[in-house]
Amino acid sequence: MAILGLGTDIVEIARIEAVISRSGERLARRVLSDNEWAIWETHQQPVRFLAKRFAVKEAAAKAFGTGIRNGLAFNQFEVFNDELGKPRLRLWGEALILAEKLGVAHMHVTLADERHYACATVILES
């Protein structure tokens, strides 16, 4: 196994809150998958939830070396938790095609949040 990509991102939670205040659900609609949207709608801390998802997806886009462009979209990366609560990534559409093209066999995700920030790191392995 070799490391194919590494990405990290940090998000100021107040920035996400400001965007939601200005534009309502538009950012959440752009960033979240359908499954994540269902969780976001009833989450006790929706701003923090969205900030963490945004950080993971930015980190994943950096790990792939592409950023969010050329057909790649935030909602093609889905963050979910395994049976032990560990964050995982599920890919759709162009993100899945790119992962297959690069030979990605494993994706490692870590995310954390504190009072003002959410951060995430994604490692892609062959």
Curated annotation (Swiss-Prot):
GO terms for molecular function: holo-[acyl-carrier-protein] synthase activity; magnesium ion binding. The keyword Lipid metabolism applies. It catalyses: apo-[ACP] + CoA = holo-[ACP] + adenosine 3',5'-bisphosphate + H(+). InterPro entries: 4-PPantetheinyl_Trfase_dom (IPR008278), 4-PPantetheinyl_Trfase_dom_sf (IPR037143), ACPS (IPR002582), Ppantetheine-prot_Trfase_dom (IPR004568). Keywords: Cytoplasm, Fatty acid biosynthesis, Fatty acid metabolism, Lipid biosynthesis, Lipid metabolism, Magnesium, Metal-binding, Transferase. It is an enzyme of class 2 (transferase). It comes from the Bacteria. SUPFAM superfamilies: 4'-phosphopantetheinyl transferase. Its cofactor is Mg(2+). It is found in: Cytoplasm. Mg(2+) binds at D9, E58. Its EC number is 2.7.8.7. GO terms for biological process: fatty acid biosynthetic process. One of its GO terms (cellular component) is cytoplasm. The keyword Methyltransferase does not apply. Its main location: cytoplasm. HAMAP family: AcpS (MF_00101). Belongs to the P-Pant transferase superfamily. AcpS family. Transfers the 4'-phosphopantetheine moiety from coenzyme A to a Ser of acyl-carrier-protein. NCBIfam families: acpS, pantethn_trn. This is Holo-[acyl-carrier-protein] synthase. It comes from Salmonella newport (strain SL254). The gene is acpS.
